[in-house]
């Protein structure tokens, strides 16, 4: 492999993608963050959050997806198997390590200027993480910050995976978002 056309990450996976981007030697052409959790939370608070988040995700497995609507904005039957599998596979140690390495209360890592200009930080206007958008905009002033009007956390990729994939292909091919009816002007 000599290059990556796109690095895409969602939710808490944004931390992992950002770590990859700051360390990889491979050229990356475009980056798309969908509802990235760019919260900056102190270590003690993250430690307190760990058992609660662990139980919430495990409950998806124990309830066969019945708690999905309480945890996420939707309970679409098509996504339940993924969340059930995640709940089944999750260990407390993995959850603790993930939170130890994520959402840290420290400055955002810098990106090369050229890559920053080809990076999209998308947020749904209805998602809780929208509140982090302003701090991300300050850290990466040359990036694009599209808002999906009326959408919740990761709603487009969950409710229309094929449409989301077409949008990402468009980003790869043209370096911009296509016209989308819910894209805030």
Give the residues covered by each predicted segment.
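Conserved acidic catalytic loop of the alpha/beta-hydrolase fold
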Residues: 1-5
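Gly/Ala-rich beta-loop-alpha elbow adjacent to hydrolase catalytic centers
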Residues: 8-13, 17
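Flexible "cap/lid" loop of the alpha/beta hydrolase fold
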Residues: 22-58
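Conserved alpha/beta-hydrolase catalytic His-Asp/Glu region
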Residues: 60-113
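Conserved serine/cysteine hydrolase catalytic core
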Residues: 100-138, 156-157
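Catalytic histidine neighborhood in serine/cysteine hydrolases
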Residues: 140-154
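Catalytic histidine-centered segment of alpha/beta-hydrolase-like enzymes
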Residues: 151-165
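Alpha/beta-hydrolase-fold serine-hydrolase catalytic core, especially in secreted/extracellular enzymes
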Residues: 176-185
């Amino acid at each position: 492999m000599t290059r990556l056309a796109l690095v895409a990450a969602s939710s808490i996976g944004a931390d992992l993608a950002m770590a990859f981007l700051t360390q990889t030697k491979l050229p990356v052409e475009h980056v798309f963050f969908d509802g990235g959790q760019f919260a900056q939370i102190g270590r003690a608070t993250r430690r307190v959050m760990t058992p609660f988040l662990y139980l919430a995700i495990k409950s998806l497995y124990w309830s066969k997806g019945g708690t999905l609507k309480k945890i996420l904005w939707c309970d679409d039957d098509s996504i339940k198997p993924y969340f059930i599998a995640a709940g089944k596979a999750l260990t407390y140690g993995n959850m603790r390590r993930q939170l130890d390495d994520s959402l840290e209360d420290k400055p955002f890592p810098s990106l090369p200027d050229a890559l920053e200009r080809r990076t999209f930080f998308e947020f749904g206007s209805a998602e809780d993480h929208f509140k982090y958008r302003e701090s991300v905009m300050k850290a990466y002033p040359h990036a694009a910050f599209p808002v999906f009007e009326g959408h919740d956390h990761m709603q487009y990729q969950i409710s229309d995976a094929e449409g989301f994939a077409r949008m990402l292909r468009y980003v790869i091919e043209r370096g911009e978002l296509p016209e989308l009816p819910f894209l805030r002007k």
